[in-house]
């Protein structure tokens, strides 16, 4: 964690006084499960707290920034900003993914690149930052990293990857596109779904998500990337 601490101080001016919070934020359940005898804490509870802090900061920002936008539009913007893929992108942009502690199995299966894990890490980090330094520190950090992207208009439009994939594949005629859940993991309150998208019965790609809808979108996005779109 020393390298992570140095990075946080150098890049963002953040110095944690409670080092254990930072370590917990970067510990995935798979790592904790593989080291049960050490009684290591994982980041799910911090993720819960960080999600609330993130929602509040973004909500206040949108309320103040767009005084004429109706509630419905602001809700859509917020949903786009805090969606799993967006948070995963910010995690990678900050270089946080290299510091997360994963179990061996999760590491081998590509967990370090999985949007669900990276999005959860982002929220857990915010939760740890909130407990260590309060909401102003969370707001300051988000103003450094997330808000500039909102100001650039990068979240004005929600991309429907399923529709985009359908339009891409049906250019030359109708095809049968199906989405199938091929795996479910995690406790009941924190399920992760693995979705397979197939075209005319042939597997095209897979995706992961905390809900079936999110997993479908992830699978469709992955398929578009494979098709070079």
Curated annotation (Swiss-Prot):
User: Where is this chain's protein located in or outside the cell?
Assistant: Cytoplasm
Q: List the disulfide bonds.
A: none
Give UniProt keywords alphabetically: Cytoplasm, Endonuclease, Hydrolase, Magnesium, Metal-binding, mRNA processing, Nuclease, RNA-binding, rRNA processing, rRNA-binding, tRNA processing
Q: Which CDD domains match?
A: DSRM_RNAse_III_family, RIBOc
Name the reaction it catalyses: Endonucleolytic cleavage to 5'-phosphomonoester
What GO cellular component term, any one, is given? cytoplasm
Its needed co-factors are: Mg(2+)
Which PROSITE patterns does its entry note?
Answer: DS_RBD (PS50137), RNASE_3_1 (PS00517), RNASE_3_2 (PS50142)
- Which family does the UniProt entry place this protein in? Belongs to the ribonuclease III family.
Full protein name: Ribonuclease 3
């Amino acid at each position: 964690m020393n390298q992570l601490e140095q990075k946080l101080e150098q890049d963002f001016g953040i110095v944690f006084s409670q080092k254990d919070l930072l370590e917990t934020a970067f510990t995935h359940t798979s790592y904790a499960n593989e080291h049960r005898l050490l009684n290591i804490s994982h980041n799910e509870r911090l993720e819960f707290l960080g999600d609330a802090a993130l929602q509040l900061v973004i909500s206040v920002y949108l309320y103040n920034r767009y005084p004429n936008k109706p509630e419905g539009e602001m809700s859509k913007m917020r949903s786009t900003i805090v969606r799993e893929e967006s948070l995963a992108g910010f995690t990678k942009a900050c270089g946080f993914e290299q510091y997360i502690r994963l179990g061996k199995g999760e590491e081998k299966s590509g967990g370090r690149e999985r949007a669900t894990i990276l999005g959860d890490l982002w929220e857990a980090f915010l939760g740890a930052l909130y407990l260590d330094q309060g909401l102003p520190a969370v707001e300051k950090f988000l103003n450094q990293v997330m808000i500039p992207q909102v100001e650039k208009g990068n979240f004005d439009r929600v991309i429907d990857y399923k529709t985009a994939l359908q339009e891409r594949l049906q250019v030359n005629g109708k095809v049968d596109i199906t989405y199938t859940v091929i795996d479910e993991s995690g406790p009941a309150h924190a399920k992760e779904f693995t979705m397979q998208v197939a075209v005319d019965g042939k597997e095209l790609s897979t995706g992961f998500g905390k809900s079936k809808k999110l997993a479908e979108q992830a699978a469709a996005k992955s398929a578009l990337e494979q098709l070079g779109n």
